[in-house]
From Swiss-Prot:
GN (gene name): rplS
Gene3D superfamilies: 2.30.30.790
Keywords: Ribonucleoprotein, Ribosomal protein
Keyword Kinase: no
Short name of any one Pfam family annotated for the protein: Ribosomal_L19
GO molecular function annotation: structural constituent of ribosome
GO cellular component: cytosolic large ribosomal subunit
InterPro entries associated with the record: Ribosomal_bL19, Ribosomal_bL19_sf, Translation_prot_SH3-like_sf
Function: This protein is located at the 30S-50S ribosomal subunit interface and may play a role in the structure and function of the aminoacyl-tRNA binding site.
Similarity annotation: Belongs to the bacterial ribosomal protein bL19 family.
Organism whose genome encodes this protein: Christiangramia forsetii (strain DSM 17595 / CGMCC 1.15422 / KT0803)
Entry protein name: Large ribosomal subunit protein bL19
One example of a Gene Ontology biological process annotation: translation
Entry keyword Cytoplasm: no
Amino acid sequence: MESLVKYVQDEFVDRKDLPEFSAGDTITVYYEIKEGQKTRTQFFRGVVIQKRGTGSSQTFTIRKMSGTVGVERIFPINLPAIQKIEINKKGSVRRARIFYFRGLTGKKARIKEAIRK
């Protein structure tokens, strides 16, 4: 049964060409918002906390600080409203899910930049 679900996802779900990113990376997600008849593009820039799931049901969580309040947003990878994703900075973290990042403030909340080869 799982192979049938995977086959349908691979064949019929549209794949977007999105860059590869992982936990610790700082990315900007540009997505479309519909307000009545108008549509506008809004962006959300923050640190990737986690990537979860596989295939077409994959999601990722981004966290940013808005003043002194932390804001997290979960995006499905195949959300039709996503226009593009930019990687601003590659971060070097040891874990795939950096939930400990929620409790850090100030200079402790910095992520070391990864060395690109």
